[in-house]
């Protein structure tokens, strides 16, 4: 069900919500996207919606955009009972002719979602507001990546004509800077979101001692040289995740070699491959057997969040690991 299906819904009374969901049930929708500005700001409507979906839609996945200012612990508790992703717009705000980015608000909302173990995504924009610049966009991206969102979306890279958030050249954001921002955004969309990198991204970034935006800028250049950048027409969501994983590992090896950290790359490769196998099991139901150089118990432990310490303290142990769907969810065993 597309966001366009909500265009005729206004007011969000209990009856209108019931009617909308009844249409979803008749259509046997398995994934429903909720994208409505008025709804996103209406806490009471969001709670009504969540309670109804918990009761009547146990097998449907909902992607629900909620205004950060409306999100609170009560909504998080209600959302925790259904299969969903909460989508948040992290935007610049304006007051008295100045723009600002409310890091305190956004970090608190992300903390609520992480505490409730909810999947959430963040939507970022660039050059759509007076006062924005390439530097402030990169700052927002760096800030967002550190909040552990499941995905970071950039609607402006999905369509050349974005009516909601059109880009425009200003004294602070040149046409060349807009192209750079677009390429960085597309690189993030490919590597982080399509690459399902959230479990390990910050861990592999730490030894490189660079910010996320710098990493994605370098990956954007790697994509350009490989003819899989924005201008090439490459669509990362249409590529099997296993192929994105190969791209990730190829680029990460380049970066680790560049920083003279080749001795750490075996750890990185094992962490990426094991987490990738779990991602494909969850996303595509794909069971597999992979070869690892370390015990999977170690690779999935908190110690793996510090790549350098892991390499120094954990002994290598060749394993054949089966990734499979267990009775209580994704599981693994050493063969």
Predicted regions and their residues:
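C-terminal accessory region of radical SAM enzymes
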Residues: 166-199
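Radical SAM enzyme core and accessory elements
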Residues: 186-335
């Amino acid at each position: 069900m597309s966001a366009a299906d909500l265009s005729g819904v206004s007011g969000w009374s209990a009856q209108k919500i019931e009617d909308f969901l009844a249409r979803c049930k008749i259509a046997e929708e398995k994934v429903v996207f909720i994208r409505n500005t008025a709804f996103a700001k209406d806490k009471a409507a969001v709670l009504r919606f969540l309670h109804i979906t918990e009761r009547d839609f146990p097998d449907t996945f909902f992607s629900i955009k909620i205004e950060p200012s409306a999100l609170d612990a009560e909504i998080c508790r209600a959302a925790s009972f259904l299969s969903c992703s909460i989508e948040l717009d992290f935007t610049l705000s304006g007051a008295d002719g100045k723009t600002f980015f409310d890091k305190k608000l956004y970090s608190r909302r992300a903390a609520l979602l992480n505490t409730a173990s909810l999947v959430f995504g963040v939507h970022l924009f660039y050059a759509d507001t007076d006062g924005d610049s390439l530097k402030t966009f990169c700052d927002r991206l760096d800030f967002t990546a550190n909040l552990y969102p499941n995905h970071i979306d950039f609607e402006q890279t999905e369509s050349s004509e974005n009516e909601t958030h059109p880009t425009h050249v200003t004294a602070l954001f040149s046409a060349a800077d807009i192209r750079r921002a677009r390429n960085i955004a597309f690189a993030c969309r490919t590597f982080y979101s399509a690459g399902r990198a959230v479990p390990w991204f910050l861990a592999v970034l730490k030894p490189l001692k660079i910010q996320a935006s710098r990493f994605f800028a370098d990956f954007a250049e790697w994509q350009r040289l490989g003819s899989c950048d924005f201008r090439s027409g490459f669509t990362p969501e249409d590529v099997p995740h296993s192929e994105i994983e190969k791209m990730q590992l190829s680029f990460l090896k380049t970066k680790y070699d560049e920083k003279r950290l080749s001795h750490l790359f075996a750890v990185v490769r094992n962490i990426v491959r094991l987490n990738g196998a779990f991602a494909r099991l969850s996303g595509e139901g794909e069971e597999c057997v992979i070869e690892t150089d370390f015990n999977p118990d170690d690779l999935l432990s908190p110690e793996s969040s510090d790549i350098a310490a892991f390499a120094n303290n954990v002994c290598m142990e060749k394993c054949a690991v089966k990734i499979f769907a267990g009775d209580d969810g994704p599981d693994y065993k050493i063969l």
